[in-house]
């Protein structure tokens, strides 16, 4: 009996399941029913080549979460990845680094993708609660206008997939535009800037190496200096570089996005202050003191003033301090700073600030 020829289209349907983006399910859950005929970015594939289907495309993201990049040494944050469903549910909530009780802004319940859920007084955002079919995003409920703005985002879930990003953008960013496409949303156009968990920085669709990766337990700090129009990123409370300049007079919002199923991020600090003489002095003090010391502890300040500065400008004085250095910093970043402790990363550029202050 003659052998029946293979149906190439049927084989394409079978093998296309391999090409489905790994974001579509949590890395610790059993595989869901596959959607036939779709490639890794959610777009329909018209290729009839059997050879191409036998190999994974190089752009397929890893379903294995990033580990070992946590701010703290909690076991649940740094343990090697285990695909066991039991292990996933046994991960305990880590509270390290969450000292603040007052927040200038939280996530905006009216400016978010449909695949997002808010909790913890709108400070924690969870993406794709059951499964993922694209990219979800959200922005803060306050526009970052005049002054100095600093906030920290903590990765409270496994970090994996096509992309999970932290950044800023204008009100023109369509947060629901890519709800059926897996992509790096922040920085895809000229209206936003985004830092990926892979360490890539993106703006206008152009990506560049910026830092090492970050994962569950990592704390990503963002400083927007509207006085000079400068955007700076921190990882685990150590500077990793200046990401953008010439941002003056732009109406920006804090933003995050994720393609990963059952992923989440939490605002653990959001504060702002005027570009005052007090701020400039604190920024200069941080530059002059070694990174190994806590500025508020070593300076002979009256208790009342120390408390006021701690509440208002603690983020300026404590970046890179001893408390932060007890945790692992970003030592492999390739950024404009040259190193995590580079003084050019300290908030404020004193020479330029001094000149502008004289004009006031």
UniProtKB/Swiss-Prot annotation:
SMART domains: SPRY (SM00449)
Domain SOCS box: 264-315
Low complexity bias: start-end ranges: 331-346
Keywords per UniProt: Nucleus, Ubl conjugation pathway
Record GO terms (molecular function): ubiquitin-like ligase-substrate adaptor activity
GO terms under biological process: negative regulation of cGAS/STING signaling pathway; negative regulation of epithelial to mesenchymal transition; proteasome-mediated ubiquitin-dependent protein catabolic process; protein K48-linked ubiquitination
Top-level lineage group: Eukaryota
Gene Ontology CC terms: Cul5-RING ubiquitin ligase complex; nucleus
Biological or metabolic pathway of the protein: Protein modification; protein ubiquitination
Name the record gives this protein: SPRY domain-containing SOCS box protein 3
N-terminal signal peptide: none
Gene field: spsb3
Pfam families cross-referenced by the UniProt entry: SPRY
CDD domains xref list: SPRY_SOCS3
Subunit structure: Substrate-recognition component of the ECS(SPSB3) complex, composed of spsb3, cul5, elob, elob and rnf7/rbx2.
Protein family (similarity comment): Belongs to the SPSB family.
Function: Substrate-recognition component of a cullin-5-RING E3 ubiquitin-protein ligase complex (ECS complex, also named CRL5 complex), which mediates the ubiquitination and subsequent proteasomal degradation of target proteins.
Native organism: Xenopus tropicalis
Keyword Nucleus: yes
InterPro entries linked: B30.2/SPRY, B30.2/SPRY_sf, ConA-like_dom_sf, FBXO45-Fsn/SPSB_families, SOCS_box, SPRY_dom, SPRY_SPSB3
Subcellular location: Nucleus
Comment, domains: The SOCS box domain mediates the interaction with the Elongin BC complex, an adapter module in different E3 ubiquitin ligase complexes.
Domain B30.2/SPRY: 85-274
Positions of region (Disordered): 20-55, 323-350
Presence of keyword Endoplasmic reticulum: no
